[in-house]
Protein backbone atom coordinates (compact mmCIF):
# COMPACT_ATOMS: atom_id res chain seq x y z
CA UNK A 1 0.00 0.00 0.00
CA UNK A 2 2.84 2.36 0.87
CA UNK A 3 4.49 1.60 -2.47
CA UNK A 4 1.28 2.47 -4.34
CA UNK A 5 0.96 5.72 -2.37
CA UNK A 6 4.50 6.76 -3.32
CA UNK A 7 3.92 5.79 -6.94
CA UNK A 8 0.65 7.74 -7.03
CA UNK A 9 2.27 10.88 -5.59
CA UNK A 10 5.00 10.68 -8.22
CA UNK A 11 2.55 10.24 -11.11
CA UNK A 12 -0.38 12.37 -9.93
CA UNK A 13 0.05 14.83 -12.83
CA UNK A 14 -0.37 12.00 -15.31
CA UNK A 15 -3.37 10.76 -13.36
CA UNK A 16 -4.96 14.22 -13.60
CA UNK A 17 -4.50 14.27 -17.37
CA UNK A 18 -5.94 10.75 -17.53
CA UNK A 19 -8.95 11.94 -15.52
CA UNK A 20 -9.36 14.87 -17.91
CA UNK A 21 -9.26 12.66 -21.02
CA UNK A 22 -11.59 10.05 -19.53
CA UNK A 23 -13.95 12.81 -18.41
CA UNK A 24 -14.06 14.28 -21.91
CA UNK A 25 -14.70 10.88 -23.50
CA UNK A 26 -17.36 10.00 -20.93
CA UNK A 27 -19.08 13.35 -21.38
CA UNK A 28 -19.10 12.99 -25.16
CA UNK A 29 -20.17 9.35 -25.52
CA UNK A 30 -21.72 8.01 -22.31
CA UNK A 31 -23.27 10.76 -20.17
CA UNK A 32 -26.17 11.44 -22.54
CA UNK A 33 -26.94 7.71 -22.90
CA UNK A 34 -26.76 6.69 -19.24
CA UNK A 35 -28.39 9.14 -16.85
CA UNK A 36 -26.83 7.40 -13.85
CA UNK A 37 -23.37 8.38 -15.13
CA UNK A 38 -24.29 12.06 -15.25
CA UNK A 39 -26.03 11.91 -11.87
CA UNK A 40 -23.14 10.13 -10.15
CA UNK A 41 -20.40 12.34 -11.60
CA UNK A 42 -22.34 15.51 -10.79
CA UNK A 43 -22.79 14.41 -7.16
CA UNK A 44 -19.17 13.33 -6.71
CA UNK A 45 -17.97 16.49 -8.43
CA UNK A 46 -19.99 18.62 -6.01
CA UNK A 47 -18.52 16.73 -3.04
CA UNK A 48 -14.99 17.32 -4.35
CA UNK A 49 -15.61 21.04 -4.94
CA UNK A 50 -17.18 21.48 -1.50
CA UNK A 51 -14.18 19.80 0.12
CA UNK A 52 -11.83 22.11 -1.76
CA UNK A 53 -13.85 25.26 -1.08
CA UNK A 54 -14.16 24.35 2.61
CA UNK A 55 -10.64 25.64 3.36
CA UNK A 56 -10.34 28.46 0.82
CA UNK A 57 -11.32 31.33 3.13
CA UNK A 58 -9.27 30.14 6.14
CA UNK A 59 -6.29 29.52 3.84
CA UNK A 60 -6.51 32.98 2.26
CA UNK A 61 -6.72 34.60 5.70
CA UNK A 62 -3.80 32.65 7.19
CA UNK A 63 -1.51 32.86 4.18
CA UNK A 64 -1.97 36.62 3.78
CA UNK A 65 -1.36 37.26 7.48
CA UNK A 66 1.78 35.10 7.40
CA UNK A 67 2.90 36.70 4.14
CA UNK A 68 2.62 40.19 5.63
CA UNK A 69 4.40 39.09 8.79
CA UNK A 70 7.29 37.60 6.79
CA UNK A 71 7.61 40.74 4.70
CA UNK A 72 7.70 42.82 7.85
CA UNK A 73 10.46 40.75 9.41
CA UNK A 74 12.37 40.81 6.14
CA UNK A 75 12.92 44.56 6.55
CA UNK A 76 15.97 43.74 8.62
CA UNK A 77 17.70 42.65 5.41
CA UNK A 78 17.83 46.31 4.40
CA UNK A 79 17.44 48.27 1.23
CA UNK A 80 17.86 45.28 -1.11
CA UNK A 81 14.68 43.70 0.27
CA UNK A 82 12.77 46.98 0.04
CA UNK A 83 13.87 47.63 -3.53
CA UNK A 84 13.12 44.04 -4.55
CA UNK A 85 9.65 44.21 -3.01
CA UNK A 86 8.96 47.46 -4.89
CA UNK A 87 10.09 45.94 -8.19
CA UNK A 88 8.07 42.76 -7.72
CA UNK A 89 4.91 44.56 -6.60
CA UNK A 90 5.09 46.96 -9.57
CA UNK A 91 5.49 44.16 -12.09
CA UNK A 92 2.74 42.11 -10.43
CA UNK A 93 0.36 45.09 -10.58
CA UNK A 94 1.27 45.60 -14.24
CA UNK A 95 0.70 41.91 -14.96
CA UNK A 96 -2.71 41.99 -13.27
CA UNK A 97 -3.71 45.11 -15.19
CA UNK A 98 -2.63 43.55 -18.49
CA UNK A 99 -4.40 40.34 -17.60
CA UNK A 100 -7.69 42.14 -17.05
CA UNK A 101 -7.57 44.66 -19.91
CA UNK A 102 -6.36 42.46 -22.79
CA UNK A 103 -9.02 39.73 -22.38
CA UNK A 104 -11.66 42.47 -22.25
CA UNK A 105 -10.33 44.10 -25.43
CA UNK A 106 -10.17 40.83 -27.40
CA UNK A 107 -13.43 39.54 -25.86
CA UNK A 108 -11.74 36.40 -24.57
CA UNK A 109 -14.30 33.64 -24.12
CA UNK A 110 -16.97 35.46 -26.13
CA UNK A 111 -18.84 32.96 -28.27
CA UNK A 112 -18.04 30.12 -25.85
CA UNK A 113 -21.00 28.93 -23.81
CA UNK A 114 -20.52 26.92 -20.63
CA UNK A 115 -23.79 25.68 -19.18
CA UNK A 116 -23.22 25.45 -15.42
CA UNK A 117 -25.17 25.79 -12.22
CA UNK A 118 -24.79 29.12 -10.49
CA UNK A 119 -22.44 29.41 -7.55
CA UNK A 120 -23.79 28.72 -4.08
CA UNK A 121 -21.49 31.40 -2.64
CA UNK A 122 -22.73 34.97 -2.75
CA UNK A 123 -20.89 37.11 -5.25
CA UNK A 124 -19.36 40.39 -4.16
CA UNK A 125 -21.65 43.24 -5.15
CA UNK A 126 -19.98 46.15 -6.92
CA UNK A 127 -22.55 48.75 -7.91
CA UNK A 128 -20.30 51.80 -7.59
CA UNK A 129 -16.93 52.98 -6.38
CA UNK A 130 -18.64 54.42 -3.28
CA UNK A 131 -20.19 51.05 -2.50
CA UNK A 132 -16.75 49.50 -2.89
CA UNK A 133 -15.27 51.84 -0.29
CA UNK A 134 -18.22 51.40 2.07
CA UNK A 135 -17.96 47.62 1.93
CA UNK A 136 -14.22 47.44 2.58
CA UNK A 137 -14.36 47.14 6.37
CA UNK A 138 -16.36 44.20 7.73
CA UNK A 139 -18.62 45.14 10.63
CA UNK A 140 -18.69 41.45 11.50
CA UNK A 141 -15.64 39.40 10.38
CA UNK A 142 -17.41 36.12 11.16
CA UNK A 143 -20.26 37.15 8.88
CA UNK A 144 -17.73 38.02 6.16
CA UNK A 145 -16.30 34.50 6.32
CA UNK A 146 -19.70 32.81 6.55
CA UNK A 147 -21.22 34.92 3.77
CA UNK A 148 -18.33 34.38 1.38
CA UNK A 149 -17.42 38.09 1.12
CA UNK A 150 -13.84 37.72 -0.12
CA UNK A 151 -13.19 41.47 -0.23
CA UNK A 152 -13.90 41.89 3.48
CA UNK A 153 -11.89 38.76 4.31
CA UNK A 154 -8.90 40.22 2.44
CA UNK A 155 -9.16 43.55 4.27
CA UNK A 156 -9.56 41.81 7.63
CA UNK A 157 -6.45 39.73 6.84
CA UNK A 158 -4.50 42.89 6.06
CA UNK A 159 -5.58 44.54 9.31
CA UNK A 160 -4.55 41.53 11.39
CA UNK A 161 -1.25 41.11 9.55
CA UNK A 162 -0.10 44.71 9.90
CA UNK A 163 -1.33 44.89 13.50
CA UNK A 164 0.76 41.83 14.41
CA UNK A 165 3.80 43.55 12.91
CA UNK A 166 3.03 46.73 14.87
CA UNK A 167 2.77 45.06 18.29
CA UNK A 168 5.96 43.05 17.76
CA UNK A 169 6.77 40.35 20.31
CA UNK A 170 3.34 40.56 21.94
CA UNK A 171 1.83 39.26 18.72
CA UNK A 172 4.13 36.24 18.47
CA UNK A 173 1.75 33.80 20.27
CA UNK A 174 -1.14 34.63 17.93
CA UNK A 175 1.19 34.52 14.94
CA UNK A 176 2.24 30.99 15.91
CA UNK A 177 -1.42 29.96 16.15
CA UNK A 178 -2.16 31.41 12.71
CA UNK A 179 0.95 29.73 11.34
CA UNK A 180 -0.25 26.40 12.73
CA UNK A 181 -3.73 26.97 11.31
CA UNK A 182 -2.12 27.80 7.97
CA UNK A 183 -0.30 24.46 8.03
CA UNK A 184 -3.56 22.68 8.87
CA UNK A 185 -5.29 24.36 5.91
CA UNK A 186 -2.44 23.41 3.59
CA UNK A 187 -2.49 19.82 4.82
CA UNK A 188 -6.23 19.50 4.29
CA UNK A 189 -6.04 21.01 0.81
CA UNK A 190 -3.05 18.84 -0.14
CA UNK A 191 -5.01 15.79 1.03
CA UNK A 192 -8.02 16.81 -1.03
CA UNK A 193 -5.71 17.34 -3.99
CA UNK A 194 -4.85 13.62 -3.96
CA UNK A 195 -8.41 13.08 -5.16
CA UNK A 196 -7.97 15.60 -7.99
CA UNK A 197 -7.89 13.00 -10.80
CA UNK A 198 -11.29 11.73 -9.66
CA UNK A 199 -12.50 15.28 -9.04
CA UNK A 200 -11.42 16.44 -12.50
CA UNK A 201 -13.15 13.45 -14.09
CA UNK A 202 -16.39 14.06 -12.20
CA UNK A 203 -16.49 17.83 -12.76
CA UNK A 204 -15.56 17.74 -16.45
CA UNK A 205 -18.17 15.11 -17.44
CA UNK A 206 -21.24 17.38 -16.89
CA UNK A 207 -19.47 20.32 -18.57
CA UNK A 208 -18.60 18.34 -21.69
CA UNK A 209 -22.02 16.67 -21.76
CA UNK A 210 -23.71 20.08 -21.72
CA UNK A 211 -21.33 21.90 -24.09
CA UNK A 212 -19.89 19.21 -26.38
CA UNK A 213 -16.60 19.56 -28.27
CA UNK A 214 -16.68 23.35 -27.92
CA UNK A 215 -15.26 22.88 -24.41
CA UNK A 216 -12.10 21.23 -25.77
CA UNK A 217 -11.61 23.78 -28.54
CA UNK A 218 -12.16 26.76 -26.25
CA UNK A 219 -9.73 25.49 -23.59
CA UNK A 220 -7.05 24.76 -26.20
CA UNK A 221 -7.48 28.26 -27.64
CA UNK A 222 -7.32 29.73 -24.15
CA UNK A 223 -4.01 27.95 -23.45
CA UNK A 224 -2.46 29.27 -26.68
CA UNK A 225 -3.53 32.84 -25.92
CA UNK A 226 -2.35 32.48 -22.33
CA UNK A 227 1.13 31.36 -23.36
CA UNK A 228 1.39 34.23 -25.85
CA UNK A 229 0.54 36.59 -22.98
CA UNK A 230 3.02 34.89 -20.62
CA UNK A 231 6.04 35.15 -22.86
CA UNK A 232 4.96 38.43 -24.43
CA UNK A 233 4.97 39.92 -20.93
CA UNK A 234 8.40 38.42 -20.22
CA UNK A 235 9.91 39.72 -23.45
CA UNK A 236 8.41 43.21 -23.28
CA UNK A 237 8.30 44.04 -19.56
CA UNK A 238 11.36 42.15 -18.31
CA UNK A 239 13.27 42.95 -21.49
CA UNK A 240 12.57 46.66 -21.06
CA UNK A 241 13.42 46.51 -17.35
CA UNK A 242 16.85 44.93 -17.85
CA UNK A 243 17.56 47.29 -20.76
CA UNK A 244 16.44 50.57 -19.20
CA UNK A 245 16.98 49.95 -15.48
CA UNK A 246 19.56 47.16 -15.56
CA UNK A 247 21.70 48.57 -18.41
CA UNK A 248 21.96 45.05 -19.84
CA UNK A 249 21.23 43.75 -23.35
CA UNK A 250 17.94 41.83 -23.34
CA UNK A 251 19.42 39.30 -25.77
CA UNK A 252 22.32 38.66 -23.41
CA UNK A 253 19.92 38.44 -20.47
CA UNK A 254 17.54 35.90 -22.01
CA UNK A 255 20.41 33.79 -23.32
CA UNK A 256 22.04 33.74 -19.88
CA UNK A 257 18.92 32.78 -17.93
CA UNK A 258 17.69 30.09 -20.33
CA UNK A 259 18.89 27.09 -18.23
CA UNK A 260 17.01 28.28 -15.14
CA UNK A 261 13.91 29.17 -17.18
CA UNK A 262 13.78 25.71 -18.78
CA UNK A 263 14.30 24.05 -15.41
CA UNK A 264 11.41 26.04 -13.95
CA UNK A 265 9.22 25.07 -16.90
CA UNK A 266 9.91 21.40 -16.30
CA UNK A 267 9.70 21.34 -12.51
CA UNK A 268 6.84 23.86 -12.00
CA UNK A 269 8.73 25.03 -8.90
CA UNK A 270 10.34 28.43 -8.35
CA UNK A 271 11.87 27.24 -5.09
CA UNK A 272 13.53 24.20 -6.68
CA UNK A 273 15.09 26.49 -9.30
CA UNK A 274 16.69 28.90 -6.79
CA UNK A 275 20.24 27.42 -6.94
CA UNK A 276 20.29 27.41 -10.75
CA UNK A 277 18.80 30.92 -10.92
CA UNK A 278 21.53 32.24 -8.60
CA UNK A 279 24.20 30.53 -10.68
CA UNK A 280 22.88 32.04 -13.94
CA UNK A 281 22.74 35.64 -12.71
CA UNK A 282 26.04 35.47 -10.83
CA UNK A 283 28.15 33.63 -13.41
CA UNK A 284 26.64 34.99 -16.63
CA UNK A 285 25.29 38.44 -15.70
CA UNK A 286 27.70 39.61 -13.01
CA UNK A 287 25.15 39.95 -10.21
CA UNK A 288 26.72 39.91 -6.75
CA UNK A 289 25.98 37.09 -4.34
CA UNK A 290 24.67 39.66 -1.87
CA UNK A 291 21.94 40.74 -4.29
CA UNK A 292 21.07 37.29 -5.64
CA UNK A 293 20.97 35.65 -2.19
CA UNK A 294 18.20 38.04 -1.13
CA UNK A 295 16.35 38.74 -4.38
CA UNK A 296 16.04 35.21 -5.80
CA UNK A 297 14.53 33.56 -2.66
CA UNK A 298 12.32 36.60 -2.04
CA UNK A 299 11.14 36.51 -5.65
CA UNK A 300 10.34 32.81 -5.38
CA UNK A 301 8.04 33.74 -2.51
CA UNK A 302 6.36 36.99 -3.56
CA UNK A 303 6.94 37.46 -7.30
CA UNK A 304 3.88 35.94 -8.94
CA UNK A 305 3.55 38.02 -12.12
CA UNK A 306 2.52 35.12 -14.34
CA UNK A 307 0.06 33.87 -11.75
CA UNK A 308 -1.56 37.32 -11.86
CA UNK A 309 -1.85 37.07 -15.64
CA UNK A 310 -3.19 33.53 -15.33
CA UNK A 311 -5.81 34.44 -12.74
CA UNK A 312 -6.96 37.53 -14.64
CA UNK A 313 -7.22 35.70 -17.96
CA UNK A 314 -9.13 32.82 -16.40
CA UNK A 315 -11.57 35.09 -14.58
CA UNK A 316 -12.36 37.06 -17.74
CA UNK A 317 -12.51 33.92 -19.90
CA UNK A 318 -14.96 32.12 -17.63
CA UNK A 319 -16.98 35.29 -17.04
CA UNK A 320 -17.56 35.72 -20.77
CA UNK A 321 -18.10 31.99 -21.33
CA UNK A 322 -20.65 31.81 -18.50
CA UNK A 323 -22.27 35.15 -19.40
CA UNK A 324 -21.29 36.80 -16.11
CA UNK A 325 -20.92 40.55 -16.46
CA UNK A 326 -17.70 42.03 -15.05
CA UNK A 327 -18.21 45.75 -14.44
CA UNK A 328 -15.44 48.35 -14.32
CA UNK A 329 -15.65 48.56 -10.53
CA UNK A 330 -15.46 44.77 -10.31
CA UNK A 331 -12.41 44.83 -12.59
CA UNK A 332 -10.70 47.24 -10.18
CA UNK A 333 -11.59 44.98 -7.25
CA UNK A 334 -10.28 41.85 -8.98
CA UNK A 335 -7.11 43.73 -9.95
CA UNK A 336 -6.38 44.72 -6.34
CA UNK A 337 -7.31 41.32 -4.94
CA UNK A 338 -5.22 39.62 -7.60
CA UNK A 339 -2.10 41.53 -6.56
CA UNK A 340 -2.75 40.77 -2.89
CA UNK A 341 -3.45 37.07 -3.45
CA UNK A 342 -0.41 36.69 -5.71
CA UNK A 343 1.81 37.95 -2.90
CA UNK A 344 -0.16 36.35 -0.08
CA UNK A 345 -0.30 32.77 -1.32
CA UNK A 346 3.17 32.07 -2.74
CA UNK A 347 4.61 28.72 -3.68
CA UNK A 348 2.18 26.57 -1.71
CA UNK A 349 0.55 23.29 -2.77
CA UNK A 350 -2.71 24.29 -4.44
CA UNK A 351 -1.84 27.96 -4.04
CA UNK A 352 -2.88 28.95 -7.56
CA UNK A 353 -6.07 26.93 -7.20
CA UNK A 354 -6.86 28.66 -3.91
CA UNK A 355 -6.26 32.07 -5.50
CA UNK A 356 -8.50 31.25 -8.44
CA UNK A 357 -11.25 29.97 -6.14
CA UNK A 358 -11.13 33.20 -4.14
CA UNK A 359 -11.28 35.41 -7.24
CA UNK A 360 -13.97 33.28 -8.88
CA UNK A 361 -16.09 33.60 -5.76
CA UNK A 362 -15.55 37.35 -5.73
CA UNK A 363 -16.58 37.63 -9.38
CA UNK A 364 -19.68 35.49 -8.88
CA UNK A 365 -18.65 32.73 -11.30
CA UNK A 366 -20.42 29.35 -11.25
CA UNK A 367 -18.84 26.75 -8.97
CA UNK A 368 -18.36 24.41 -11.93
CA UNK A 369 -15.57 26.54 -13.44
CA UNK A 370 -13.24 25.27 -10.72
CA UNK A 371 -13.28 21.76 -12.13
CA UNK A 372 -12.53 23.03 -15.63
CA UNK A 373 -9.68 25.19 -14.35
CA UNK A 374 -8.13 22.40 -12.26
CA UNK A 375 -8.09 20.13 -15.32
CA UNK A 376 -5.64 22.45 -17.12
CA UNK A 377 -3.88 23.85 -14.06
CA UNK A 378 -0.65 21.90 -14.60
CA UNK A 379 -0.30 23.08 -18.20
CA UNK A 380 -0.85 26.65 -17.05
CA UNK A 381 1.52 26.26 -14.11
CA UNK A 382 4.46 25.21 -16.31
CA UNK A 383 4.45 28.47 -18.25
CA UNK A 384 3.60 30.58 -15.21
CA UNK A 385 6.50 29.22 -13.15
CA UNK A 386 8.92 29.79 -16.02
CA UNK A 387 7.89 33.44 -16.36
CA UNK A 388 7.98 34.01 -12.60
CA UNK A 389 11.56 32.74 -12.44
CA UNK A 390 12.55 34.99 -15.35
CA UNK A 391 11.09 37.89 -13.37
CA UNK A 392 13.15 36.95 -10.30
CA UNK A 393 16.35 37.07 -12.34
CA UNK A 394 15.33 40.32 -14.07
CA UNK A 395 14.88 41.84 -10.61
CA UNK A 396 18.44 40.80 -9.73
CA UNK A 397 19.86 42.55 -12.79
CA UNK A 398 17.87 45.73 -12.10
CA UNK A 399 18.81 45.86 -8.41
CA UNK A 400 22.48 45.21 -9.15
CA UNK A 401 22.54 48.33 -11.33
CA UNK A 402 20.25 50.59 -9.29
CA UNK A 403 21.43 49.96 -5.71
CA UNK A 404 24.76 50.93 -4.22
CA UNK A 405 26.06 47.74 -2.62
CA UNK A 406 28.33 48.28 0.33
CA UNK A 407 31.43 46.13 0.44
Task: Indicate where each model-derived feature is located.
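Signature of multi-pass transmembrane helix bundles
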Residues: 3-7, 13-17, 24-28, 32, ...
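Transmembrane alpha-helical segments and their short flanking loops
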Residues: 111, 312-407
Amino acid sequence: MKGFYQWYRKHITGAIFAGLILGILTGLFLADKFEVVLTATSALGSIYMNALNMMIFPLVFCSIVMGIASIGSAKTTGKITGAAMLFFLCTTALASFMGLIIPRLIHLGRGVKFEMATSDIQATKMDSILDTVKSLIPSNPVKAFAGGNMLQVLVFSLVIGFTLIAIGEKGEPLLKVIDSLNEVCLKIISTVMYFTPIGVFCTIVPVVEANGTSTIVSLATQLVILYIAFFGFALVVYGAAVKVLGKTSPIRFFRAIMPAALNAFGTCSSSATIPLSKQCVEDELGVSNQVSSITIPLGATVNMDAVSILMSFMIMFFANACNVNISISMMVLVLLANVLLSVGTPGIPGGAIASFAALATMAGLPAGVMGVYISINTLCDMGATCVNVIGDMAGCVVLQEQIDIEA
